[in-house]
């Protein structure tokens, strides 16, 4: 009898030990899961930050974020316009696969797997704040002729976001509910904010006034606070409208640039106002003691709409690079890119590793332990950046492919292949280099893309052409639905 009791006590001890070890392992796993925030500006050019060399623009918070984290010297938007890029952020796949090849058309296919859905399965709470642009938010109205309200109805809540405060497309950067500032031809509240499926019809009455970037952050921060209070890891997408048109600067920000022309004042004011909200976000993360293990990303959705010599408020700068929004030359797709993650990234790091918005999905999946190869029928264009983050390096294992708006491109570690489907120079090409059907550039020696090497290095060009054609063929299969069968 004594022996039996001893055995029972031993078994009870084993069970309790297993329970507490399992609980400890769960708590460790919970603590190890980083929060994830994807911040994105709209039409912000490579040269539109202080840390990238702008001599006038005040972006102290982005500059501080770049100093505190990993600054990408070759970070690319997934496309040269916004809707396709936004889809790459959430799916890890190029727009040629998920069906939105340009802005204001179509919707993200329902067969796609979104970052919010996967993270929801992993216990994350997900929120989207700001510009959506991946479908309509109303099933009976859209302000864009290229979208069918019923057929293209797709809200953030339909792809895994628990909370959302979003607009279908761009709104004014100041007082978006003022009819005088309407982005569309006429004012309609359905083109402004929707909150969890309900149209915010009277934003003036609910305090949605002043700086639009602040309005967005005013909604994002309570979401983060709530998740932290509930000890739930969070995934937060903050997609600003700034500095997309209508570009309207607030009085206090305009006053920061007294020596500039009115057009430059407004553009600079809008960027500085956005930067201020990045500062609020970073301060809140520190206040909540979650900054250490939060992956905070920042980028832009494409290059600048205009250029510093424009006779309007489109005063964005692509820096030294050729091209701007709508172009697959560097100025249209190379954008500011920063990752701040103190738990994994030492302050002051810079990298020349080519990275792209499609890399967000596989990188985060790598961190949370989701095995992408399980779905062998679904090609992913992005790559996990965790090896770069943990060990460094400059060589990307696979080139980045682009397509859209009459151009195709393949960008490797050194060489970039450009395919112009038309030899007519686009209005988005502000470069001085030649424009032929096929072009090859050495981005290390010639980042401005001025010297076409296609005749000098035919073997390199042919190899890249073959790789590009294989990728285009794969995308065509995806477009026809092969990935969803």
What are these model-derived regions, one by one?
Residues 1-2, 485:
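Accessible peptide chain termini
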Residues 2-16:
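Bacterial N-terminal signal peptides that target proteins for export
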Residues 28-439, 443, 447-485:
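Formylglycine-dependent sulfatase
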Residues 4-6, 23, 39, 44:
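Short linear motifs centered on Gly/Pro in flexible linkers and helix caps
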Residues 2-4, 20, 33:
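Intrinsically disordered, low-complexity segments
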Residues 14-25:
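Bacterial N-terminal signal peptides
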């Amino acid at each position: 009898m004594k022996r039996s009791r001893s055995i029972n006590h031993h078994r009870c001890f084993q069970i309790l030990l297993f329970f507490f070890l399992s609980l400890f392992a769960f708590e460790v796993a919970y603590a190890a899961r980083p929060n994830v925030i994807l911040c994105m500006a709209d039409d912000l050019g490579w040269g539109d930050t202080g840390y990238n060399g702008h001599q006038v623009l005040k972006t102290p918070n982005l500059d501080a974020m770049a100093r505190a984290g990993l600054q990408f010297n070759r970070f690319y938007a997934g496309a040269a316009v916004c809707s396709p890029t936004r889809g790459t952020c959430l799916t890890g796949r190029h727009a040629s696969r998920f069906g939105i090849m340009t802005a204001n058309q179509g919707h993200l296919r329902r067969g796609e797997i979104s970052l919010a859905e996967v993270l929801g399965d992993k216990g994350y709470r997900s929120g989207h704040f700001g510009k959506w642009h991946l479908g309509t938010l109303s099933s009976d109205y859209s302000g864009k002729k290229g979208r069918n309200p019923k057929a293209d109805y797709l809200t953030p809540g339909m792809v895994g976001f628990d909370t959302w405060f979003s607009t279908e497309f761009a709104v004014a950067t100041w007082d978006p509910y003022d009819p005088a500032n309407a982005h569309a031809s006429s004012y309609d509240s359905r083109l402004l904010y929707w909150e969890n499926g309900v149209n915010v019809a009277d934003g003036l009455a609910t305090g949605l006034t002043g700086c639009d970037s602040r309005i967005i952050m005013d909604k994002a921060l309570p979401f983060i606070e709530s998740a932290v209070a509930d000890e739930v890891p969070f995934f937060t997408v903050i997609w600003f409208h700034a500095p997309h048109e209508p570009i309207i600067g607030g009085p206090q920000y305009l006053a920061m640039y007294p020596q500039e022309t009115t057009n430059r004042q407004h553009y600079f004011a809008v960027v500085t106002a956005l930067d201020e909200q990045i500062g609020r976000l970073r301060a809140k993360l520190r206040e909540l003691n979650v900054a250490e293990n939060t992956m905070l990303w920042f980028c832009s959705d494409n290059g600048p709409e205009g250029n510093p010599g424009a006779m309007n408020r489109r005063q964005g700068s692509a820096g030294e690079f050729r091209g701007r929004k709508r172009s697959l030359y560097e100025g249209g797709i190379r954008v500011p890119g920063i990752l701040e993650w103190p738990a994994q990234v030492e302050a002051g790091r810079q990298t020349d590793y080519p990275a792209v918005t499609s890399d967000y999905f596989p990188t985060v999946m790598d961190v949370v332990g989701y095995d992408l190869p399980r779905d062998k029928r679904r090609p992913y264009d992005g790559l996990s950046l965790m090896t770069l983050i943990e060990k460094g390096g400059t060589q990307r294992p696979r080139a980045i492919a682009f397509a859209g708006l009459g151009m195709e491109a393949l960008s490797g570690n050194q060489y970039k292949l450009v395919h112009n489907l038309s030899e007519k120079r686009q209005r988005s090409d502000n470069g001085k280099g030649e424009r032929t059907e096929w072009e090859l550039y050495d981005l290390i020696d010639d980042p401005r893309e001025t010297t076409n090497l296609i005749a000098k290095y035919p073997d390199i060009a042919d190899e890249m052409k073959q790789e590009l054609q294989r990728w285009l063929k794969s995308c065509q299969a995806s477009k026809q639905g092969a990935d969803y069968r």
